């Protein structure tokens, strides 16, 4: 029998581009013993199909019928109880600085993806190991965590062909061991998790895991996925992914792009800036930063946070004021004003690949990493000592003139500033800055630091 070693790897990828789709269903591969079930969503109607090429007329009545079906499908998917995620704001505000600090230079993470992975981890643990996870996630008990995670998943899943926010999870089990079916069923029902079983740590199972990760993240983290493997001692793996793509509500014009200098920590460099003017767009400020947001077609926002001169993104994260505003009080704060904002934003494509063991332990999740205290009896009732060995998180974020693409996956394997001017401001992101992509429910899908676009 294998030693009870747990390896946890978290990887996240986030890009800003256009268009993404979930792969078509296929027959379960060898080793897959449970298939995920995803909600059916009506596709967004293609306007071009309702134009008569001969007359040039638009069939508005037919389009309205299809549009109404799509809209009803969206509302049914997103209709979650008011305040379902209120208790998560503290977790996100506290954890994002730790997650980003794990990277040097450019940094990116998917807080939502990490939340889903930790919620799944709570399902397979017990005792104090589980309690520490629930305390960090501000969950009163497992029932409350399950209810909240279910709402979070459904509120953010979208596969309508216009905007994509595809969430996927999987559970990987060692063959020959006895597992309690209850947490496996909970992961399938609430987290839409596929289940695989085989000889973990062999080339065959490593290849299946990498194929699954690449498929769910649309190949956006292929280089990072190539480094994922399970130790022969691994007896359990959890994997969680997110693939997100959306267009700007108002796209940037490529003709307005300019070449300019970005003042990176390691020296100035020429980059391409995308430029636009927000007429009376909201501008926010705090004691050490200024911020604007760009709307996306799905109701999400990309927040751009520029530290004051002499301040760094790490300073802004440490103060917590910007995260408090973005994840909480941005709509009510007095530190906002409608201005004409001349925005210059560098195009970027950044990647992170880090270990989060220390970050999670600093948040208070410690017992699962210790073979002497880790409790995985919820899933492995008769098992010997087992522990969480490694937590790896990789993320990628890219933006262009059209919009945002983001993807993430988590694998757990067991074995200012002064008040702005009156009317107009130049918001030029030509030095290191922060960004957050928040959903329509104001949960952080992705966060990052751009030091060298």
Pin down the residues of each PLM region.
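Detector for small/aliphatic-rich hydrophobic stretches
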Residues: 15, 20-199
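Non-catalytic, conformational "gating/processing" segments within enzyme and secreted inhibitor domains
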Residues: 104, 109-114, 142-310, 333-420
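Feature captures eukaryotic membrane-trafficking machinery centered on endolysosomal pathways
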Residues: 106-130, 293, 421-453
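Non-catalytic interaction/Regulatory regions outside core domains
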Residues: 10, 20, 25, 32, ...
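Composition- and surface-driven signal marking solvent-exposed, interaction-prone regions
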Residues: 251-254, 307, 315-321, 411-412, ...
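Sec-dependent bacterial lipoprotein signal peptides
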Residues: 1-18
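Internal alpha/beta scaffold segment
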Residues: 307-337
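Short Gly/aromatic-enriched secondary-structure transition segments
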Residues: 133-137, 252-261, 313-323
């Amino acid at each position: 029998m294998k030693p009870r070693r747990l390896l946890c790897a978290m990887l996240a990828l986030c890009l800003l581009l256009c268009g993404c789709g979930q792969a078509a269903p296929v027959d379960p591969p060898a080793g897959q013993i449970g298939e995920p079930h995803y909600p059916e969503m009506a596709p967004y109607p293609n306007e071009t199909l309702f134009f008569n090429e001969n007359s040039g007329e638009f069939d508005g009545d037919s389009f309205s019928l299809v549009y109404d079906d799509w809209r009803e499908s969206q509302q049914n998917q997103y209709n979650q109880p008011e305040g379902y995620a209120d208790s998560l704001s503290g977790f996100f505000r506290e954890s994002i600085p730790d997650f980003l600090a794990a990277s040097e230079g450019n940094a990116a993470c998917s807080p939502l993806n990490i939340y889903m992975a930790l919620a799944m981890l709570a399902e397979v643990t017990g005792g104090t190991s589980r309690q520490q996870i629930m305390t960090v996630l501000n969950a009163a008990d497992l029932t409350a965590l399950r209810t909240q995670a279910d709402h979070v998943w459904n509120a953010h899943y979208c596969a309508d062909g216009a905007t994509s926010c595809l969430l996927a999870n999987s559970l990987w089990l060692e063959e020959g061991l006895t597992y309690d079916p209850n947490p496996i069923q909970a992961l399938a029902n609430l987290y839409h998790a596929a289940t695989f079983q085989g000889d973990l740590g062999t080339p065959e199972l490593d290849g299946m895991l990498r194929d699954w990760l690449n498929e769910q993240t649309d190949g956006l983290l292929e280089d990072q996925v190539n480094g994922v493997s399970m130790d022969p001692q691994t007896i359990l793996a959890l994997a969680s992914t997110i693939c997100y793509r959306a267009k700007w509500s108002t796209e940037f014009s490529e003709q307005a792009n300019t070449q300019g200098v970005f003042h990176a920590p390691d020296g100035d460099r020429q980059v391409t800036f995308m430029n636009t003017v927000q007429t009376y767009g909201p501008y926010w400020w705090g004691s050490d930063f200024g911020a604007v947001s760009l709307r996306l077609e799905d109701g999400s926002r990309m927040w751009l946070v520029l530290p004051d001169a002499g301040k760094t993104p790490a300073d802004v994260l440490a103060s917590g004021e910007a995260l408090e505003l973005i994840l909480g009080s941005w709509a009510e704060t007095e530190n906002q004003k409608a201005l004409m904002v001349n925005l210059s934003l560098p195009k970027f494509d950044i990647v992170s690949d880090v270990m989060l063991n220390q970050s999670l332990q600093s948040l208070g999740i410690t017992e699962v990493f210790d073979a002497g205290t880790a409790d995985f009896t919820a899933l492995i009732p008769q098992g010997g000592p087992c522990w969480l060995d490694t937590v790896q998180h990789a993320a990628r974020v890219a933006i262009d003139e059209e919009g945002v693409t983001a993807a993430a996956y988590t694998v757990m394997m067991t074995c200012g500033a002064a008040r702005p001017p009156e009317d107009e401001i130049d918001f030029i992101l030509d030095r290191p800055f922060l960004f957050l992509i928040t959903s329509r429910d104001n949960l952080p899908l992705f966060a990052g630091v751009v030091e060298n676009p």
